């Protein structure tokens, strides 16, 4: 245990917090260009073909981002907006693409949780 004199001379260093989404550089979202759009398989015990994209960001980073929802229109050179948020069963995927902004269209025929998938409110059915 240090003496009071040692603490005066060399104060205790604060533990530095490590960010979970360094590519955003403290911003809520970042714009980027898709360099590759592909599917990948999740960790055990899950099984699927998850849609992901490799995105080159305006901050200079190149990251892997998840494409949420059923069906998408993204391809190489699509401009997208990404946010933080990892995908638990995809190692290395720490970002999500925001649907309904820039080149990423909203999910079609989405009824619930529409705001999360960039879908406009459906027109009321004609009687």
UniProtKB/Swiss-Prot annotation:
One of its GO terms (cellular component) is small ribosomal subunit. Residues 1-28, 104-127 are annotated as: Disordered. The modification 3-methylthioaspartic acid is found at residue 89. It comes from the Bacteria. It holds the Pfam family Ribosom_S12_S23. Keywords: Methylation, Ribonucleoprotein, Ribosomal protein, RNA-binding, rRNA-binding, tRNA-binding. GO terms for biological process: translation. Residues 109-127 have a biased composition (Basic residues). GO terms for molecular function: rRNA binding; structural constituent of ribosome; tRNA binding. NCBIfam families: rpsL_bact (TIGR00981). Part of the 30S ribosomal subunit. Contacts proteins S8 and S17. May interact with IF1 in the 30S initiation complex. With S4 and S5 plays an important role in translational accuracy. Belongs to the universal ribosomal protein uS12 family. This is Small ribosomal subunit protein uS12. It comes from Microcystis aeruginosa (strain NIES-843 / IAM M-2473).
């Amino acid at each position: 245990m240090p003496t009071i004199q040692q603490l005066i001379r060399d104060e205790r260093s604060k533990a530095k917090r490590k960010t979970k989404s360094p590519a955003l550089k403290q911003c809520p979202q970042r714009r980027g260009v898709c360099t590759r759009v592909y599917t990948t398989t999740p960790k055990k015990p899950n099984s699927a073909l998850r849609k992901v994209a490799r995105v080159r960001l305006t901050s200079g980073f190149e990251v892997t981002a998840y494409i949420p929802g059923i069906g998408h229109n993204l391809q190489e050179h699509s401009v997208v907006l990404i946010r933080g948020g990892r995908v638990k069963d995809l190692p290395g995927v720490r970002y999500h693409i925001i649907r309904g902004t820039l080149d990423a269209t909203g999910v079609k025929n989405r009824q619930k949780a529409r705001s999360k998938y960039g879908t406009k409110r459906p027109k009321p059915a004609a009687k």
